């Protein structure tokens, strides 16, 4: 199951909303933190906290360590076309590393693996500029985009990478799990392993897909590692 929810839900005053989010995260295999890249990179990052809710995300995860301990977290910068074309994807990853340092320090203390996996969302357009927003309650500025060439085409890039990282984590966790004492095994993966352990062919096919992981190039970098995930 894949579930998306806005950052505002993390500070919801409705108890059932908070409990729903916590329970979903506690039973998740991987947590994706989407990053609107132009807000991260442009105008000195002035509007980054407002758009990407950096403090809210950081404090929520730190306050709910039991839901994320021993897991995989992917920071996924979106709308990276401009930075790919300008050869600046590594700068995007370094900015993520700098911006979320408090959170990744926390990850390092709690056996949480984290990586940056930038995505080229559309491919045919790229960021151009920021303009004032006229929508009440919206962020102060909105992104303006332009065509990348005369005949822009829909050409997303790197979109399967979060899935490849997820599969890598699942296969690594399965192998790690077999070495643990029964009382130490977490329950959040049980439903997945109930069929993996009985289908070795399926498991081997999953392992083959992990070879497509992009690592240490094109802005794909590790931020923290843990005792479970292994990427060559």
Regions found by a protein language model. Give the residues of each.
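Conserved C-terminal guanine-recognition region of P-loop GTPase G domains, centered on the G4
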Residues: 19-111
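Canonical P-loop GTPase G-domain recognition
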Residues: 74, 82-169
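A structural motif corresponding to the C-terminal end of an alpha-helix
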Residues: 60-71, 102-114, 165, 169, ...
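Switch II (G3) loop of P-loop NTPases
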Residues: 1-18
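Short linear functional motifs in flexible/disordered or boundary regions
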Residues: 40-43, 128, 174, 178
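C-terminal accessory extensions appended to soluble enzyme cores
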Residues: 142-232
């Amino acid at each position: 199951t894949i579930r998306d929810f806005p950052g505002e839900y993390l500070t919801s005053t409705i108890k059932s909303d908070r409990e729903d989010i916590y329970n979903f995260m506690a039973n998740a295999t991987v947590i994706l933190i989407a990053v609107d890249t132009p807000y991260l990179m442009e105008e000195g990052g002035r509007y980054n906290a407002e758009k990407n809710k950096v403090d809210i995300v950081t404090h929520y995860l730190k306050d709910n360590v039991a839901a994320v301990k021993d897991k995989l977290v992917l920071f996924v910068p979106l709308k990276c076309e401009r930075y790919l074309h300008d050869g600046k994807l590594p700068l995007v990853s370094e900015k993520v590393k700098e911006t979320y340092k408090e959170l990744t320090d926390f990850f390092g203390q709690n056996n949480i693996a984290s990586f940056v996996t930038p995505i080229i969302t559309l491919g045919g357009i790229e960021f151009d500029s920021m303009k004032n927003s006229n929508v009440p309650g919206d962020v102060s500025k909105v992104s303006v985009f332009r065509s990348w060439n005369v005949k822009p085409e829909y050409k997303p890039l790197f979109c399967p990478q979060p899935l490849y990282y997820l599969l890598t984590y699942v296969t690594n966790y399965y192998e790690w799990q077999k070495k643990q004492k029964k009382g130490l095994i977490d329950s959040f993966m049980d439903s997945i392993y109930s069929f993996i352990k009985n289908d070795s062919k399926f498991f081997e096919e999953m392992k083959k897909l992990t070879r497509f992981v992009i690592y240490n190039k094109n802005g794909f970098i590790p931020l923290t590692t843990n005792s479970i995930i292994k990427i060559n």
